[in-house]
């Protein structure tokens, strides 16, 4: 019985990154022996055990054979005769197929250390094509390690394209697709995830609403990058610089889906694209079972981002209506999410990444003024029933109007 540290812990140590989780591989043992040593079995599909003291995971070495479609269409053979090399052979990337024994010696039969040196995400074997989930995993690793200079090896990208054409991606469950997407959104370079999927043909299969944006032109006056797909990913990058909040990043990703529905004769203009995108966002979120808070913010951003961009031209009554619609009185963090996504939208344009966005401070100030209106004072003044809400609305509008008038007076003649 031999025990090895494997996978991400070894890889991250070699990259000089913080190690979060440790996974161990056990070679030359059986479930019966593990149980006799006090380990507790937790794996249903293959033998995984928890250490009796530290509760870390220990998996028996195994061989997998393709038996059906999708990422779970495999049979598992875990026995005491499976070697370290055989277990590492089934792993996705060479950088994830390095093991460290109890003496600290590295075992690297497939060249993972060389690929770390050369910053390559490379498949271990041709069996890579048997698991469609690996397309998403490699794209996620490309996003995660982009800042370190990693790229997908040419031959690995070819295999990813092969999987995309095979129909295997359609067998992935919504939960697994969203899980990988959400983990990619949490990286420092989330846009790279979608760039890699587009490059191998998987974007069209798994995220057709985003794929449809590529090739859709926008007015060059406002969008030097012209292409809506490019703008979307540039905006996502800007969102990642502004916030770690994944709901805001997701809302930024889907804020312009409606532009794919603009009539060809009206291009490059996109009248009402925010509202046209609402059914597409709902469809996207329902298909992939996106969390409700992500969906709700995404719908708000799509519906209102043009209004926020035009904030200085909006009437006070329109602003109060916007605050009502966004439920900002109860959930002020939603206003922050909306404004952050709008900033990312404005800065997600080639050459305009440093653009100022005074609309955000203006909207925030208007909201704070409206929020200062006290309901208790309205009740004390004798208003009852529906008149309370009407007076509250009137005073909120008045507060914003007075502020707007003060700004006009400050302007030079």
Curated annotation (Swiss-Prot):
InterPro entries found in the cross-reference section: CCA_bact (IPR012006), HD_domain (IPR006674), NT_sf (IPR043519), PolA_pol_head_dom (IPR002646), PolyA_RNA-bd (IPR032828), tRNA_CCA-adding_enzyme (IPR050124)
Binding residue positions for Mg(2+): 21, 23
Positions that bind CTP: 8, 11, 91, 137, 140
Gene3D superfamilies linked to this entry: Beta Polymerase, domain 2, cca-adding enzyme, domain 2
EC number: 2.7.7.72, 3.1.3.-, 3.1.4.-
Pfam families tied to this protein: HD, PolyA_pol, PolyA_pol_RNAbd
Protein name: Multifunctional CCA protein
Native species: Shewanella denitrificans (strain OS217 / ATCC BAA-1090 / DSM 15013)
Gene designation: cca
């Amino acid at each position: 019985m031999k025990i090895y540290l494997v996978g991400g812990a070894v890889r991250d140590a070699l990259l000089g990154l913080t190690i979060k989780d440790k996974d161990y591989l056990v070679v030359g043992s059986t479930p019966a022996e593990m149980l006799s040593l006090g380990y507790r079995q937790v794996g249903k599909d293959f033998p995984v055990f928890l250490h009796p003291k530290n509760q870390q995971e220990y998996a028996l070495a195994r061989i997998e054979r393709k038996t059906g479609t999708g990422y779970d269409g495999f049979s598992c053979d875990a026995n005491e005769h499976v070697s370290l090399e055989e277990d590492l052979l089934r792993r996705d990337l060479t950088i994830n197929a390095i093991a460290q024994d109890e003496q600290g010696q590295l075992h690297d039969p497939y060249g993972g250390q060389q690929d770390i040196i050369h910053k390559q995400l490379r498949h271990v074997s041709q069996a890579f094509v048997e698991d469609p989930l690996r397309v998403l995993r490699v794209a996620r690793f490309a996003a995660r390690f982009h800042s370190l200079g990693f790229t997908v090896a040419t031959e690995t990208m070819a295999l990813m394209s092969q999987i995309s054409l095979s129909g295997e991606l359609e067998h992935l469950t919504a939960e697994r697709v969203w899980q990988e997407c959400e983990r990619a959104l949490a990286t420092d370079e989330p846009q790279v995830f979608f760039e890699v999927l587009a490059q191998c043909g998987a974007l069209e299969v798994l995220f057709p609403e985003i794929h449809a944006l590529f090739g859709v032109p926008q007015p060059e006056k406002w969008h030097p990058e012209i292409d809506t797909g490019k703008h979307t990913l540039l905006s996502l990058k800007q969102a990642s610089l502004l916030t770690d909040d994944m709901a805001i990043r997701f809302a930024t990703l889907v804020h312009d889906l409606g532009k794919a529905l603009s009539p060809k004769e009206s291009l490059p203009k996109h009248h009402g694209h925010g509202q046209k995108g609402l059914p597409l966002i709902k469809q996207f979120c329902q298909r992939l079972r996106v969390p409700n808070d992500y969906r709700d913010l995404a719908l708000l951003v799509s519906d209102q981002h043009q209004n926020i961009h035009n904030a200085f031209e909006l009437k006070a009554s329109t602003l109060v209506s916007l605050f009502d619609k966004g439920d900002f009185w109860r959930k002020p963090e939603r206003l922050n999410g909306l404004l952050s996504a709008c900033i990312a939208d404005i800065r997600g344009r080639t050459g305009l990444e440093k653009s100022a966005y005074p609309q955000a401070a203006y909207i925030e100030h208007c909201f704070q003024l409206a929020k200062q209106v006290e309901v208790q004072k309205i009740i004390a003044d004798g208003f009852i029933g529906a008149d309370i809400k009407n007076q509250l609305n009137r005073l909120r509008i008045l507060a914003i109007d007075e502020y707007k008038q003060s700004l006009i007076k400050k302007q030079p003649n």
